[in-house]
A protein has these predicted regions:
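Conserved acetyl-CoA-binding loop of GNAT-fold acetyltransferases
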Residues: 4, 158-168
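Conserved beta-strand-loop-alpha-helix junction that forms the acyl-donor binding cleft
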Residues: 144-155, 171-182
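A short beta-loop-alpha structural element at the N-terminal edge
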Residues: 31-43
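Acyl-donor-binding surface of acyltransferase catalytic domains
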Residues: 1-28
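Conserved acetyl-CoA-binding loop-helix of GNAT-fold acetyltransferases
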Residues: 110-113, 119-136, 156-160
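A conserved beta-strand-loop-helix scaffold within acyl/acetyltransferase catalytic domains
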Residues: 47-112
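Hydrophobic adenine-recognition pocket in adenosine-nucleotide-binding enzymes
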Residues: 35, 111-113, 147
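Conserved GNAT acetyl-CoA-binding A-motif
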Residues: 134-147
Length: 198
């Protein structure tokens, strides 16, 4: 669940020991399915339900931009959904690529679980599935993700998978110089640590 009561700052987390991660399975009644043509609305509905977008239509636009238009990767192989026993699509995540670190690197992207299905280990099962997909595609040694302060419960999950918060002083955002990035990142990490009571 996104906590909109606190300020939003972006965070980056990365992992180098990509062969080591916990193994979680979906609870009974849920199954993994991959994207197929026409599923953009399902993705957008999930993301809108968790407040990623103000409207489903905006979510569809972002899906097409991020996963369909001018993309060398296949959404059918990399965009994951979770479906419940009624056939409803209730969660999604993707293994994609990104260039925050200056070169094309694999990333966990757009993780979301509908609030009605939260607390059941679905996000953890998706993380295990995506790490296994990462390895099956022949990648090794580095993977990252972006998240934000309002998603601090997710930060704790990612840490259990060995992801670490980026704390270096080199900016990974094009709109911030190193000094501004460092100040913002320190504020963000302090806020997350406060919310996680550590």
């Amino acid at each position: 669940m996104i906590d909109t009561s606190i300020p939003y700052y972006p965070l980056i987390m990365s992992k180098t020991d990509t062969d080591i991660y916990p193994k979680h399975s979906l609870p009974n009644g849920y199954e993994f399915v991959f994207y197929k043509e026409g599923d953009a609305r399902k993705w957008a509905e999930i993301q809108t339900a968790v407040c990623s977008f103000g409207s489903v239509e905006r979510g569809i636009e972002v899906f097409i931009r991020d996963f369909i238009e001018n993309q060398p990767l296949s959404a059918e192989e990399r965009v994951l959904f979770v479906r419940d026993e009624k056939g409803e699509y209730i969660a999604t995540a993707a293994l994609w690529d990104g260039d925050h670190f200056g070169s094309r690197e694999q990333r966990i992207h757009w993780v979301a679980v509908h609030d009605a299905h939260g607390g059941k280990g679905i996000a953890k099962a998706m993380m295990t599935c995506l790490m296994e997909l990462y390895r099956s595609l022949g990648y090794n040694g580095f993977i990252y993700l972006t998240t934000g302060t309002r998603n601090y419960p997710a930060v704790a999950i990612y840490e259990r998978f060995g992801f670490k918060l980026y704390e270096e002083t080199k900016s990974l955002f094009t709109d911030l110089d190193d000094e501004a990035f460092t100040k913002q990142n320190e504020t963000a990490i302090k806020l997350v640590n406060t919310m996680l009571k550590r």
